């Protein structure tokens, strides 16, 4: 039973008349949903699902419409050789590099290069959806081990103990996996932004690699070769503080190892009664760890990262949604040509000639 149906059943209004048995106490229902210990996690998941299922799907659609605005897309793609889609991208393609290059040598027409590019770009967009799914999975497992809701202020704790074992290590691994997976979305989206801006420079008679690879495109606030509109306030490329936080945690974990080598989880108490379960994270200023010389992990701010994380994810996801939607809008703005039946026929004939060359 899903959580919504559970609460609807639980809080059905017992005072309702026999003629209206479906009434239930909406006020109690809303309060129960809000008070649920995982309410913030549910809200994060809803936003992440919206990013994946609405914004990213919209990006797929806008790319399809832009790249193939002058042909009958379905007719052409349905005849395209399977290796164009899978080889070098997916385990569905099982040939070697040598065979792939032989296939390419026989596929002379630019239509093959354009569809190879299409699937190259598609794989980056699909990778974003994969990272979103990973974040949701890691978050779900993480909050089975520690709570996202604190019941006390830090100054109220009267005692506490530090635990470090398999369960605590698992919690830290999941937490850092969230940071790594989420921050990788920034890099992937940077590649797509570069591709959108530089597309007109492609010559599909001689396509070898994507511009984002040549440019070594990775996320950074001063990234070049993206549309100026992507540097509006509220979008990814304006260096929002919450994005810097994800970058800081990711980079520390990837390049320097765990920021807590003991994988500590703190079990607090108030007047001898169990209180909050906490993972503390280092002090931060403007999205960066506070540093002094060689040290960058100070713990004076009482940062309870398991409580802060849901808001971080929500804030960053809203930024990503706006950014993805703007990239989609840029593709749509350049989708101005009508379908050309002659070009569609040319592409289909080129594919037919390719198949004949294999005989």
Model-derived regions: residue spans:
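Acidic, Ser/Thr/Gly/Pro-rich intrinsically disordered interaction regions
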Residues: 2-130, 161-173, 191-359
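A short mid-domain helix/strand-loop element embedded in enzyme catalytic domains
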Residues: 132-169, 179, 187
